[in-house]
């Protein structure tokens, strides 16, 4: 708290007068950015995959949802960098749990619909999807926490993320038994 107060040009007492602790302060600071991500993941859960055509359903896999979400974070990069560098783990852990559960729910609904329609020949367990969602979340956090990205995502880190997401995409195609569709647009820069 002293370091944060010094950077803000105030006394630690001023912070403690307003917030009961660092976690309370982080919750207040990140409320808007966190809510933006939560609203996005909640809206994804409302997607009605049953009303989509087969082509529309397959296009979801190649739409770059994760990449667009990652780009959404760029406006708040300094805040997220500060959170990852200074949080004792409580706020981030709580956020991570909720966000990953929502992403896992979305993915399970999606993969289930692919399988029901015969567009995928295999199903993934919920535990596998949870681990994949956790891995993706960890990749994003790793990039944000990198000191080279504290003022924005560097081209090198963005390219590394795009490549990692393409590897994940092709792994999902193989694991689900989906024949390769046209090359995703987000992998070409």
Predicted features along the sequence, with ranges:
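Hydrophobic alpha-helical connector segments
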Residues: 28, 42-75
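Helix-turn-helix
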Residues: 1-24, 28
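C-terminal/domain-terminus segments
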Residues: 83-100, 156-175
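An amphipathic alpha-helix signature
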Residues: 63, 67, 100-112, 133, ...
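Short, basic, alpha-helical segments at the C-terminal edge of helix-turn-helix-like DNA-binding modules
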Residues: 1, 31-38, 42-45
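Amphipathic alpha-helical packing segments from all-alpha helical-bundle domains
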Residues: 71-75, 89-117, 127-134
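Hydrophobic/aromatic-rich alpha-helical bundle segments in the mid-to-C-terminal region
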Residues: 114-167, 175-189
């Amino acid at each position: 708290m002293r370091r944060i107060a010094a950077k803000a040009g105030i006394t630690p007492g001023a912070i403690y007068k307003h917030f009961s602790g660092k976690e309370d302060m982080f919750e207040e600071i990140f409320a808007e950015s966190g809510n933006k991500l939560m609203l996005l993941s909640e809206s994804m859960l409302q997607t009605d995959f049953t009303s989509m055509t087969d082509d529309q359903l397959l296009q979801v896999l190649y739409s770059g949802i994760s990449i667009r979400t990652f780009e959404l974070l760029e406006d708040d990069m300094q805040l997220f960098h500060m959170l990852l560098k200074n949080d004792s783990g409580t706020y981030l852990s709580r956020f991570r749990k909720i966000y990953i559960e929502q992403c896992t729910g979305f993915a399970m609904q999606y993969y289930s619909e692919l399988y029901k329609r015969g567009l995928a020949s295999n199903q993934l367990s919920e535990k596998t999807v949870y681990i994949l969602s956790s891995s993706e979340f960890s990749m994003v956090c790793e990039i944000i926490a990198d000191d080279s990205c504290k003022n924005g995502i560097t081209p090198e880190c963005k390219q590394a993320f795009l490549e990692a997401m393409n590897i994940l995409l092709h792994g999902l195609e193989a694991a689900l038994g989906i024949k390769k569709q046209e090359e995703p647009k987000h992998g070409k820069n």
